[in-house]
Amino acid sequence: MELNIQTIPGYKTNQYLLVLNPHEELRNRIMQVKREFYDVYKAPTAIGGKPRVALITFTQFEMMEERIINRLKMVAMGYHPFKVELKDFGSFPSHTIFINITTKEPIRALVKEMKVAQRLMKLNDDFKPHFIDEPHLTIARKLLPWQYEQGWKEYSKKHFSARFIADSMLLLKRREGNRAYQIVQRFEFMNLPVITKQGELFM
């Protein structure tokens, strides 16, 4: 008899998402852009996803959560707050339209810092962590060809400008099959002299 690993106590898996979260006023502005896109192009993902900058996505056993939290806390303690500049729109042909992030390097450097924890985030060979190397803020994804073509024709000419200070990151999770994420923990960037060298992190 096959054993469903989801039914074993302590072996439940979650989908995790690590993000930068803009301040509330900016989130509301971006949600307005997403709603306007939905009103015209009827793309469900435009209103389904919240305005945030994804850093890492991964699937892992819930029993690993505490170790992952401790590792991310160490990285955040040693990282500095930084400015995130948003400017106009970009796209991933032929499925996604997003707001451009022009200050990519501090985000890429942060993601690189967290790669030292990738063993903790790897469930198995089929479920490896995905580190986002092209930071962006999604307006709509999984677009149909007509939605992308017509939407990009309009949004490639539109303008948007904003900035926010990233002073923390959020770890979110959801059960397989659930749509909504819940907050696991907020990690503040404290710019402290923390030892986070590779080889010392696989405790």
Spans of features found by a protein language model:
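Basic, often amphipathic N-terminal segments
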Residues: 1-83, 106-163, 180-203
